[in-house]
């Protein structure tokens, strides 16, 4: 347990990962600790490789892979005892202990009781038992599949930031006997696992509205700060790479005009004071509130758009708001392609919010923040694209000023989500970018 200092306070920093997987036994935790501490274990006589048919895996489809085992020994045969495959999801923070939120394992082979078809040709009878013996200079390809239970949280997908990392690893572990000695060979490879979200549930996410602080008209009218902002989003879930459509209503109760409107998209990382180990495990399982233990907040502006009435490239044709007038507009701001909201950390979380402020060149009159959730565009299942296409037929009008089209059907929806999902699917994905 290490200590790190912020101001005059000291906080505990544990290097040991916190395991929040559901129904993880003591033996399972020891296996996870061993996998993280020793991701690769090499031997001279056995070569092991992991191959996957796709760089991205979804929760519904599971993980399909190929395990290639080669006996490099020139003399000895190897007797296989067990073959296991593990999938581990780790969320790391720069100043907090890492969190293991996903841990799945499957036995490909277990003695003579679980034997895949590809190894039946290598079975030999020894006494009353059967053994799997691989001769020297032989190579065996063993396919495997790992399925995700319904209750398992797979996280937001691979995310790499300066302070936070979400990574997924596939481990293959083999125990074998060679020359009357038990040996272990392990291989590790990074993969990407994404949740599967249907278009219907994505589009049916509830709308959200935030209102700025109610101004005191008697006191603030003379101070030129009697303004009120009302911001509404048609839904709370948005895809990475999509344009967020926000409806903004500005009530100017002051005697001065408003000439500037700013939209800023922020990523906020909230750190919590890590409690004791037992309390930490209880909080992770029960999803208890951690607002009382907040110790740090860091915000970074990802996108910024400033609308000025005297700017030539004003695509909204906004001329400002005169004194004692009310104005309503619809603005758009683009989400970066690789952003996602992260809530699987035990001592931290990453959220996003949109900040709208109004004012003049010299000062800001009022501001409001509205939170929302960002989902990876690859998580959206495109098997039901007719959900988008049928709703897109409802409008044939071009959006003014070259902006994305917004359709109102029950909730106001932006169907730039389909194009964002298609673009991410057609773009070559690099795991180690």
Curated annotation (Swiss-Prot):
Disulfide bonds: none
GO BP: ubiquitin-dependent endocytosis
GO MF annotation, one: ubiquitin protein ligase binding
One Pfam assignment: Arrestin_C
Signal sequence annotation: none
Domain of life: Eukaryota
Stored Gene3D superfamilies: 2.60.40.640
Gene Ontology annotations for the cellular component aspect, listed alphabetically: cytoplasm; cytosol; plasma membrane
InterPro entries per UniProt: Arrestin-like_C, Arrestin_C-like, Arrestin_domain-protein, Ig_E-set
Family indicated by similarity: Belongs to the arrestin family.
Protein name from the UniProt record: Uncharacterized protein C557.05
Organism field: Schizosaccharomyces pombe (strain 972 / ATCC 24843)
